Swiss-Prot record:
Name the UniProt record assigns to this protein: Thiol:disulfide interchange protein DsbD
Source organism per UniProt: Haemophilus influenzae (strain PittEE)
Keyword Transport (UniProt): yes
Keyword annotations from UniProtKB, A to Z: Cell inner membrane, Cell membrane, Cytochrome c-type biogenesis, Disulfide bond, Electron transport, Membrane, NAD, Oxidoreductase, Redox-active center, Signal, Transmembrane, Transmembrane helix, Transport
A Pfam family per the record: Thioredoxin_2
Gene Ontology CC, one term: plasma membrane
Segments forming domain Thioredoxin: 449-579
S-S pairs: 124-129, 193-315, 495-498
Length: 579
């Protein structure tokens, strides 16, 4: 009896002990319970408002949240009110995640009820990782939210909302904003990227052997600007669709050298070395239609305007970035094209006025016209110098300008008479030639003045950037940032405004004082390497120059991005606002 009692006791004890083996099996929530997702549409249909309720102990990966309009290639960028947290993930290492909840917006144009938005996200919890979850939302099925989400905490300071973001927002909320881009174009007409187009237009109108009347001069100038605007618009849309690689491709040395050769040939023709004209058979046909060959002249002006658009295309400004940002996020090509066209038209109007004014006041006949024509030949030679300075080492730029200026002043001196006022101009021209030749003398004799050395080394010696090669190195460097802010400068050798930043802005004592409390990082985008492309895609870079700012959580400070040139005072105030 005792043995039987002991047997059953052991059996039940074993069952009791082992019954708990499966009690510890953890149950995980369904994905929709772990990450309860909902979405609404703003009243003006410019924002898709997304919300996630995240169960305690679960988290969503920041870089796994994405959205796009079905059938459109451009992704929609997410702006969240909550800051992501650093998390040591057993699957992906150190990552940024969201916990508890997410309130965010996807900006775009959501007017078509049949359009669909595809939103993808992925999350995990301890011991379990969910596969990517995708929600396909039909625009017409979304409820309209009575309260439009504004990015309350997205911007570190509302004053920091960058100009390109304000312009893009303006286009989202009112299509009438496009006419404001015409006024912005007027202001861009006198930037270093647009001014080189003036000699080309002037050479076409003023540099002709037979000076045109005002109506014809206006027609030539107008067609030139239309050609420029067309190229600028098409290239802008291509950049918005393809991205910075297209912009970089236009700056390939082969393209720059080819355009430079073209301008040199045109300049030599203005010196009378040869005449560029159509084949006789085609020219005779045109003469039959119009003895004055107006169609040929007008067609040439339009073609030269298109070439001028190539010269201006790589230059990024806040208005251009705003228009490109709108096109990339909304997919609205019509509004984007109209915006870019009006921006280019505004850039061209001052060029037209300057040319027409010069056409009216300069002499219209006599031997003086040959001198005028040859003078504009020299002016046209400035374009190859401008283009080649983008691809040659920086030291060559002053040498090329010095060579062109020296030859011009010597030539100009030889054109002057030896009597009276002409003799005085001759002496002054020779003196100026002696001054401008100095960079060539220093190069030939390998000498360098103390002042020149100080100027050349000022920005290089006093501003030290840590060079970043890829996204992994960027993340590591940001994680070790001892300062409250990090600045990432995206730079390219062909970018004119980037060089202006280096020489005029970064070298300013006020700016350098602000730099003392900022981690300075720089990426050279000249070669468009795979690492460069990864950075461009990650930060949705539209053009150069672009400067990004990051907080202590390694997040880009929303609204702080700088595109286009800023002078020292404006940039210093921008940095102060960041702090």
């Amino acid at each position: 009896m005792k043995k039987l009692f002991l047997f059953f006791t052991l059996i039940f004890t074993a069952f009791a002990a082992n019954s708990g083996l499966f009690d510890k099996k953890q149950t995980f929530l369904k994905v929709d319970d772990a990450f309860a997702f909902s979405a609404t549409l703003s009243t003006d249909k410019s924002q898709l408002q997304a919300h996630w309720d995240i169960t305690d102990g679960y988290y969503l990966y920041q870089d796994k949240i994405s959205a796009e309009l079905v059938g459109k290639s451009n992704p929609l960028s997410l702006h969240t009110q909550q800051a992501a947290e650093l998390h040591q993930d057993p699957y992906f290492g150190e990552v940024k995640v969201f916990t508890h909840s997410i309130d965010g917006i996807f900006r775009g144009t959501f007017n078509n009820a049949d359009d669909k938005v595809e939103i993808t996200y992925q999350g995990c919890t301890e011991g379990f990782c969910y596969p990517p979850e995708t929600k396909v939302l039909r625009i017409g099925d979304l409820a309209i939210s009575q309260e439009q989400i504004v990015e309350k905490t997205v911007e570190k300071n509302t004053a920091l909302l960058s100009e390109q973001d304000r312009l893009a927002d303006g286009l989202f909320h009112s299509k009438w904003t496009i006419f404001g881009f015409f006024l912005l174009g007027l202001g861009l007409a006198f930037t270093p990227c647009v001014l080189p187009m003036l000699p080309l237009l002037s050479a076409i109108v003023i540099g002709q052997q037979q000076r045109p009347n005002m109506m014809r001069a206006f027609s030539l100038a107008f067609l030139y600007v239309q050609g420029m605007a067309l190229t600028y618009t098409l290239l802008g849309l291509a950049v918005a669709a393809i991205g910075l690689p297209f912009q970089i491709a236009l700056q390939h040395p082969y393209v720059m050298i080819g355009l430079s050769i073209l301008f040199v040939v045109l300049a030599l023709s203005m010196f009378g070395l040869f005449t560029i004209q159509l084949p006789n058979s085609l020219q005779n046909k045109l003469n039959t239609w119009s003895q004055k060959q107006t169609s040929g002249a007008f067609g040439g002006a339009f073609a030269m305007g298109m070439i001028a658009g190539l010269v201006a295309s790589p230059c990024t400004s806040a208005p251009l970035s705003g228009a490109l940002l709108y096109v990339a996020q909304s997919g609205d090509l019509f509004t984007g094209a109209a915006t870019l066209y009006l921006l280019a038209l505004g850039m061209g109007v001052p060029l037209m006025l300057i040319t027409l004014f010069g056409n009216k006041i300069l002499p219209k006949s006599g031997e003086w016209m040959n001198t005028v024509k040859q003078t504009f030949g020299f002016v046209m030679l400035a374009l190859p110098v401008f283009l080649l300075s983008r691809i040659l080492p920086e030291v060559w730029e002053p040498r090329l300008w010095a060579g062109l200026a020296t030859v011009f002043f010597i030539w100009f001196a030889l054109q002057m008479s030896k009597n009276g006022f002409g003799y005085a101009i001759k002496i002054i021209s020779f003196v100026l030639a002696m001054v401008t030749v100095q960079p060539l003398q220093n190069w030939i004799w390998q000498t360098q003045t103390t002042t020149q050395s100080a100027v050349e080394n000022k920005s290089v010696s006093q501003v030290k950037f840590k060079q970043i090669k890829n996204t992994e190195e960027l993340d590591r460097t940001l994680a070790e940032n001892p300062h409250s802010i990090a600045m990432l400068d995206l730079y390219a050798d062909w970018c004119v405004a980037c060089k202006e930043f280096e020489k005029l802005t970064f070298s300013d004592p006020q700016v350098q004082q602000q730099f003392q409390n900022i981690l300075l990082l720089q990426v050279n985008m000249t070669k468009n390497s795979p690492e460069n492309k990864a950075l461009m895609e990650r930060f949705n870079v539209m053009g150069l120059p672009t400067i990004l700012f990051f907080d202590q959580q390694n997040n880009e400070i929303k609204g702080s991005r700088v595109t286009g040139f800023m002078d020292a005072d404006a940039f210093s105030n921008w940095l102060k606002a960041l702090h």
